[in-house]
Amino acid sequence: MATIKDIANLAGVSHGTVSNVLNKKGNVSVQKINLVENAVRQLGFKPNAQAKQLKQGKTNRVAIIVPKLHIKRYGDLYAGVAFVLNDSDYDLTIYSTDDSGEKETKLVDTICAENPSALIVISASLQRIARYKDSMLFYVERRVSDPDAFFYAFDFERAGTELAESAVKNGRRKVAVFCGPARYSCNEDFVRGCISVLKNAGCRCSVFYSEESMCANTAFAIVSDDAAFDAVLVFGHENEEYVKTAHAYYNPASPLQIFTVTNKSMMHGFETSAYELNYKYLGCRIAQRILHKTSETEKECILPADGFLNPSEAPRRIAKREQINLLTLNSPTAYALKALAPSFAAKTGIALKIITMPYDELYKAALESRDSKAYDLIRLDMAWLTEIGGAIFLPIDLSSDPYKTISESFSTKIPRDYYYSDNKIVALPFDISAQMLYYRKDLFEDSLIRRSFFETTKRQLTLPKTYAEYDEIASFFTKSRNKKSPTDYGTSLVIGSSVTAACEFLPRYRSYGGRFYDDTGHIKVTDPLFRKTLIEHIKSAECIPKHTLNWWSEAMNEFASGNTAMTVVFCNHASAIMHYKNSEFVNKIGFSQVPGGFPLLGGGSIGISKNTVKLDAVREFFLWLYSDHTASMISYLGGYINNKKLLSDIDILSLYPWIAGVDAAMADGRRHDEVPNAAFNEYRFEKILGSSIRSALFGILDVDSAIAEAQKNLDAAFNR
C-alpha cells in the first residue's frame, strides 16, 4: 500500500508538501500540486481518513441507529441528516437493530469504540447509553431517561388529538386506534391524545398495540373485530398499508376510513386523511445541532407537526361549472400551473385557462384589460404594480378570510411592492423573485484552480463581494484571457431586450451608491459615476458568450451546460439548471448574494380583475393556489409560489437549494426607488435606460453618445 513517503519520492517534493496538497491547503504552487496529484494517481493512493481522525482523538462519523430500515419515516430522518451534512466532512452511516434491545447494545458498543462525533438513536432497549468521550448523543421519537443526552421528537399527543378530532368531525363513532408497543413514549402519547377526544365525544373505541412483526396480524384483527369499526386511527405509513390490505381481503364493501399519522410526502393530497410529521426536517435540525449551526440551547426539542393539508381552507366544489381566465407571463410557474390545472378542475369544477405572453406583450395586455372582461386574474410584473395595479385590480382585504389565512403562509420578508398600488392592497405575491449569484462549486473548491487563481491575482478565490472582484473572477474563468480556464466564459449577461439590459446594469450602479434622480426628482444619468459604471459594465461583457441571451432561462441553460463559471439571474428562473438535459453540474451548483449586495427584486403579483363577475371561483382558485400542497407541487415542477413551509421541505431544498436564500435576497433587494417625480414610470425608465445600454454594449454608440441618448429620452419622458 502506497504511503505519503512514496508519493513524495515519486513527485520529487517534501513530505510536508504532499501533506499540504492532500489536506487541500492553499500554500502550494500549481506546479507542485500537479506533481503530487499525478503521483497519487500513479500509485493508487487512498488516504485513510478514519486513521487520521482517530489520531486526532475523534472521528467525523455520525451514526444513526433505527429499529427497521424499511420504515419510511426513519429513511426520511436519515435523508434530513444527510442533507445538512453532505457539504461537511462527515461520514454518515445508518444501522438497524430489528427493534432488538440486545442488538442495539452490541451496535452501540461497536460504534462508540470508534469515537463518533454524534450518535442518533431510536432506541429499542430504552436503556441509557454510556457515551464515549465527547460524542453527542441524540434520542429520537422514543424518550429515554438520560439528562445528558438530547431528545428530538414531535408532539405525538397533539397528533393523536387532531387525528381523533378529524375522525369525529367526519361522523365516525366506532374507532380503533392502532400503533406500536405501549412501552415507547411516542405510542403512549399518541394513544393518550386519541382516547381523550374519542371518550369526550362518546365514541366507542379500542386500542390495538402491536410489535412490528405482528402488525399484519393486528390489522386483520381490527377489520374482523365484532365492533365493526368505521374508522382506524393509525400511527405510521406501514401500519396504514397493513390495514388497507386486511380490509381489502376481509370486507372491502364495509365503510372504513383510515386516519394516519405519517411521514411528509408530496403524494398526499387534499382528499387523504394523512397527518404529516416532517422527519426530514427533524433530521435537518439534529444535523444543524451537530454542526453547531443553531441557536438552540435546550436539551429537548419538540417540533410542531405539518398536520393535515390546509384542513379548513381546502378548495371546495362550486355549484355550477365555470371557467376562469388567468393572464400571466410565460414562465416556469406558468408551466407548472398548466400541468396542475386539471387537478384544480377535478377538485372544484372550475376550468382554469392560462393565457401566457412575453414580457412586453403582457404589459400592453394588462393596460388594455381596463376595458375588457377577457381576464379574471392577471399576473403583473412587480415593477408595474404601483403604476397600473390600482386601475385594473379589485382591492384585497388581508384582514378577512380566505386572504388572511393565505397571507399567513407568506414570508414576512416580502416587501409591500408585491401588494400595494395607490396605498391599497390590490394583489398577492405570485412568482416573486430576486437576483442571486449562481456559481460552480466544483470550480471554486478545486485546490489546483484556487492556487492558479492566487498566483494570477495574488488573492484567494472566494465568492465575490464586490463587482470588482466579480469581474476579476469572470476574467480568470474566460478562456480568451486564461487559456487554462475550465470554462469558455466567466459569466453571462441577459441583454436581448431593453428591460433585461437595464436589470443587469442597475445592481452594479447601485452598489457604488448610484442614484438616477436628484432631490428635485429630475431623472439624470449624466453624472461621472454612471459613466464610470457603464464603461466597467462594457468591459465585463468581454467575459460573456458571444451570442445574445434574450431571457433569464437562457442564461441558466448556458450555465447548466458548463459553459460559464457563474451568473447572476432572477431566482424564479433558476430551476432551468435542474431541467437542463445532460448537465454534469446539477449537484455542483452554489448560490450566494449578488456582488455589491443590491439585488433587484423581480417576479410578479396576481390580482383580481375589476371586470370579473366570478369572485367565488377566484376565491377557490386562490385557496388552491396558495395551499401548502399546491405551492409544493409548483416548486417540484420548477415554478415558485412563496410558502413558509418550503423552507422545511427537504425534498424541494435538495432539488432547488437556493429557495433557502430567497428570504435574505428579498430583505436586501429592491426594484423601485421613491422618486419624487409624478411623471416617473418604472417600465418606461427601464426601457429607455436599457435601450441605450444595449447600444453601448453592441458598439452601436460610444459611451458618451449612449448616455446622451438616454438623457435626451429620459428628459422627454419625465423631466418636462
Residue ranges and their predicted role:
Residues 1-58:
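N-terminal helix-turn-helix DNA-binding module of bacterial transcription factors
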Residues 41-73, 77, 88, 113:
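N-terminal helix-turn-helix/winged-helix DNA-binding helices
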Residues 122-161, 258-273:
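Flexible loop/hinge segments that line or gate small-molecule binding clefts
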Residues 226-234, 238-321:
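Flexible loop/turn connectors
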Residues 356, 420, 549, 660-718:
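C-terminal capping/gating helix-and-loop segments adjacent to ligand/active sites or protein-protein/ligand interfaces
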Residues 382-436, 588-592, 655:
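Hinge/lid segment of periplasmic solute-binding proteins
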Residues 471-476, 508, 512-550:
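Glycine-centered hinge/linker elements that transmit conformational signals in sensory
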Residues 541-542, 580-646, 670-678, 691, ...:
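Extracytoplasmic/periplasmic substrate-recognition and gating elements
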